[in-house]
Amino acid sequence: MKSVPSAGGIVIKSFSSQRSAITPAGPARFPINLFPERAARGFPENAMPPSRWAAFAAEAAVPEQLVPYVRAVSDLEPLECGGFLAWRNGPALVLVGHDAGLKQGGAEQERSRPEAARLDAAVGEASSLRGIESLTVLAPFRPDAAPEWAVSTRPDAYWGIPLPTDAADMAYGQKLRNQLRRARRDILIAREGWKPDHAELVEQYIRSRPFAPGTRHLFRHIGPYVEAVPDALLFAARDCEGALQGFAVGDYTALGTVFHLFAFRAPESPPGTADALLDALAAEGIRRGHTLLNLGLGINPGIVFFKRKWNATILRPHVETSWAVQRPQEAGLLGSLKKLFGM
């Protein structure tokens, strides 16, 4: 079973692991301010009204800001901390520290911007919420407000391509043109609703690799997500006999950016299937007036190669930083001495 490099989508890691971020954990729920009894159980009371969900989704720079998407595939509660979107699962909170001001340039350039100080303030607010025990920040850099015991991932970056006003003006290299031409002889691309053979293709991929439970949950909720979110579109590639050769899902909720979230293809799909699916996804974005196609994180050299084939460039750096709100206890003599002398 093979899979096309996808846009990365939601960050999938278990809240029980050392590197925790957004973890799908069941069907979407209503905002917590509709359930006053949750506050008595320790939930914060600064939940967002639906109008703020729409504002974040309209200006989304990363998938975790697509509120309909996250709510369709998870049980996370949307909050707002210091003007940034955050997601809560019990004692764990994920702060999405990407916004319009925190994008182009390297990490050091980002740190010099006023928005960096705003992110640090949001980290402080998130850390002080009642019942929060662990915090993960998704941002272009490691926040200065992160404590010394915080753990950061290897720096990555979101990649993307600008979309012209006319699909005929897409900038393809000759090799990509040839692949698209070849694929179009063997497959037909069309928009479809979620079907059993889409689910089976996903299950084949899940069975082929030892995915974490959160990853399997996310993949198995692609169908409910496509069915629940009007601007989540599925493009399917089928051969002349109607057999499914692959599919891709794009999210068009944001006003200016299309997000390439998922892509799967059959093991023996014709060459260029992945490219033909992405081309259809981009063409729909152009038709709708979008100006940017977000291809997700680099992840590994193979996925970066796929993006570069499409003349993609880095949109913004990305680092995940996670920590326990309370300093972990140090065992042994050193920990005892530090406690004794107030260190």
Region locations from a protein language model:
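Intrinsically disordered, low-complexity segments enriched in small polar residues
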Residues: S3-G9, S14-S16
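Short, basic, low-complexity termini and linkers enriched in Ser/Thr/Gly/Pro
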Residues: F15-T23
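Active-site/acyl-donor-binding loops of N-acyltransferases
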Residues: T23-A60, L76, C81-L85, E148-D169, ...
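A conserved beta-strand-loop-helix scaffold within acyl/acetyltransferase catalytic domains
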Residues: G26-N89, Y172-S269
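Acyl-donor-binding surface of acyltransferase catalytic domains
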Residues: A28, S112-L188, E192
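A short, internal acetyl-CoA/4′-phosphopantetheine-binding micro-motif in the GNAT/acyltransferase core
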Residues: H98-P114, P164-D166, F262-P271
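Alpha-helical elements of Rossmann-like donor-binding domains used by nucleotide-donor carbohydrate transfer enzymes
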Residues: A121-E125, E200-Q204, A276, A280
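Aromatic (often tryptophan-rich) hydrophobic motifs at membrane interfaces
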Residues: D231-G332
